[in-house]
């Protein structure tokens, strides 16, 4: 226990967002520091924070005059300031090398980083301490977070927490009692790799604790304070018709004949399509942005022919240039790669190159050169748009500099990458996002494995979509139907269930060919594409709503019942807006399905039967044809 803290209490008047705009409420919340615990009390209880955990025992805190509450321990100072319905907690170290606070996880918590298991809520998956940076989590499964991550969390008790940019954040979810449930959300600030700081800059940790009457209210009041809404809508045809990618079907064994046959197979079997996406291994050398002349002897002729059949054509691309490519030397000589402080290019290693330069998207000249090559490729071949892969800061070399404020390293790379590629418009896709919610583009889930389970399999699909929406990325592209088939291809049942789980998400993406199974699989997938088309007008309406309010398109069940335990933990169903609920079948051989229905009258599409919520029902006689969804009846 740090001496000098007992009995220090500050009563603040904090405006808590009201559920009625015409009748605003003001609640008396109490900020209480006692026994090394900072308590932010609100309508449903309190947020308990074990704070100052690296301050030596016996250190006395002296009251200071800054902010609304201030304590100076000599080795560090904490200032607490009222900021609308939030408390801003600001730590500055004078001699400490680490600052650490832990929020006790009462209730259920959501948000933070994209994960391999993607638990919903997040306390289901304890996590070791790791730097909170965008990363290719496939490289270190269970350790790294993914490319779509924000230091933003909300709780079922009506709290929202945001760690400010510029904090060198290491984060953990420790299980302190061995029950496999995380007990704390811990923030640690350290000036260690992969973070950097200006010389002589003090170590700081700044975060907000905001409150509302419930989880939805806390989110809708707090989200606009920290993030921007999309400024428009992405490509309508991608919302409507499936993307067809060559990746999972052919992986790198792609050429013009296979692309043509792939497209003709789609068309001859009567599937709708938005575009054919030519994935990995079309380049002569990775990063040259030139077609391989042996695999694609006349790319313009191929693209023109595909256009003639009604297909748009997109290309996979990435931010690397392998050092054996002709364009490497030019980019190196002109300083377009990420460099060290002496201006020397630092190479990285990625999945298609042991030695590569990484384009520095914080360098305006590098961005102009790199994007112009893609524009030239479009002009010369007729390519319509691009799939932008990678972009995570984990690919940055260990020794690096960026052309932005050092306090924002390394995550600023991801932000600048998305800012740069978004210039190509709403027909693109990325797989990363951090502070880039304003761009009206599709954001793809990282590659899923072709398995049923929670370890990057089918059962992570819905939690991932919920996670993306909560962080402000409404236009979710759930990657390949059936997974990426890296080890084995999915069987027919898994493939059908995967397609059905995608039905009511914002976009569909096929790669593994449905007709490679049997006629039943083909028909089931056609049913999926048909149903998806029917919900597009609702998607467009919700997209327009997202531009104004920031509300997600794909919503958690608790959106309509934030006080009900069953709603707070429902992780395999989702709302599309407020009046449509989808509950995909995600267990092998399932013949029954439990569904949590929020308040209201809910009509089961398959039978027309109406259920009065809130209620949990068990549907019987589930078959491989079952696509379970409900619509909420209008109230009189």
Locations of regions flagged by a protein language model:
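Short, conserved catalytic/metal-binding motifs centered on acidic residues
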Residues: 69, 78
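Cleavable N-terminal signal peptides of Sec/SRP-targeted secreted and luminal proteins
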Residues: 2-20
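Accessory, solvent-exposed terminal regions and/or long lumenal/extracellular loops of proteins
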Residues: 634-636
């Amino acid at each position: 226990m740090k001496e000098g803290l007992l009995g220090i209490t500050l009563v603040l008047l904090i405006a808590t967002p009201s559920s009625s705009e015409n009748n605003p409420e003001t609640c008396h919340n109490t900020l209480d520091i006692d026994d090394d615990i900072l308590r932010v009390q609100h309508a449903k209880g309190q947020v308990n924070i074990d704070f100052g955990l690296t301050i030596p025992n016996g250190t006395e805190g002296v009251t200071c005059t800054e902010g609304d509450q201030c304590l100076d321990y000599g080795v560090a100072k904490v200032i607490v300031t009222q900021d609308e319905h939030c408390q801003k907690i600001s730590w500055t170290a004078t001699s400490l090398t680490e600052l650490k606070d832990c929020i006790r996880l009462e209730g259920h918590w959501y948000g933070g980083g994209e994960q391999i298991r993607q638990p919903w809520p997040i306390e289901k998956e304890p996590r070791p301490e790791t730097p909170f940076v965008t990363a290719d989590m496939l490289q270190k499964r269970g350790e790294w977070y993914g490319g779509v991550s924000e230091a933003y969390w909300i709780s079922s008790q009506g709290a929202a927490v945001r760690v400010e940019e510029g904090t060198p954040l290491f984060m953990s979810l420790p299980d302190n009692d061995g029950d496999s449930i995380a007990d704390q959300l811990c923030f640690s600030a350290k000036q260690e790799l992969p973070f950097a700081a200006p010389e002589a800059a003090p170590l700081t940790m700044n975060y907000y604790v905001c409150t509302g009457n419930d989880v939805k209210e806390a989110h809708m009041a707090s989200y606009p304070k920290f993030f921007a809404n999309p400024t428009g809508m992405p490509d309508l045809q991608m919302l409507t018709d499936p993307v067809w990618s060559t990746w999972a079907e052919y992986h790198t064994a792609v050429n013009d004949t296979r692309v043509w046959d792939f497209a003709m197979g789609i068309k001859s079997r009567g599937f709708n399509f938005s575009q054919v996406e030519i994935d990995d291994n079309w380049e002569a050398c990775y990063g040259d942005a030139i077609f391989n002349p042996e695999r694609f002897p006349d790319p313009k002729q191929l693209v023109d022919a595909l256009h003639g059949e009604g297909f748009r054509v997109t290309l996979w691309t990435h931010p690397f240039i392998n050092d054996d490519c002709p364009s490497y030397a030019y980019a190196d000589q002109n300083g377009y790669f990420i460099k060290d402080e002496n201006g020397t290019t630092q190479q990285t290693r990625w999945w298609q190159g042991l030695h590569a330069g990484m384009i520095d998207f914080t360098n305006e000249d590098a961005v102009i050169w790199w994007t112009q090559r893609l524009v030239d490729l479009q002009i010369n071949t007729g390519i319509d748009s691009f799939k932008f892969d990678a972009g995570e800061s984990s690919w940055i070399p260990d020794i690096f500099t960026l052309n932005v404020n050092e306090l924002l390293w390394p995550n600023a790379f991801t932000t600048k990458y998305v800012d740069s590629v978004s210039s190509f418009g709403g027909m693109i896709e990325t797989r990363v996002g951090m502070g880039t919610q304003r761009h009206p583009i599709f954001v793809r889930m990282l590659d899923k494995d072709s398995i049923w389970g929670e370890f990057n399999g089918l059962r992570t699909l819905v939690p991932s979509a919920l996670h993306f929406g909560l962080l402000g990325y409404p236009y979710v592209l759930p990657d390949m139907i059936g997974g990426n088939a890296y080890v084995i291809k999915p069987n027919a049942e898994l493939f059908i269930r995967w397609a059905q789980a995608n039905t009511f998400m914002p976009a569909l993406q096929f790669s593994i060919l449905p007709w490679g199974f049997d006629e039943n699989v083909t028909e089931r997938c056609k049913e999926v594409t048909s149903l998806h088309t029917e919900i597009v007008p609702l998607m467009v309406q919700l997209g327009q709503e997202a531009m104004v309010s920031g509300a997600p398109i794909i919503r958690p069940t608790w959106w309509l019942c934030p006080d009900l335990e069953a709603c707070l933990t429902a992780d395999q169903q989702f709302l599309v807006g407020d009046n449509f609920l989808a509950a995909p079948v995600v267990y092998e051989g399932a013949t029954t399905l439990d569904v949590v229905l929020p308040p209201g009258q809910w009509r089961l599409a398959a039978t027309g039967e109406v259920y009065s919520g809130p209620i949990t029902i068990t549907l019987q006689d589930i078959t491989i044809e079952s696509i379970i969804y409900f619509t909420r009846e209008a109230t009189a």
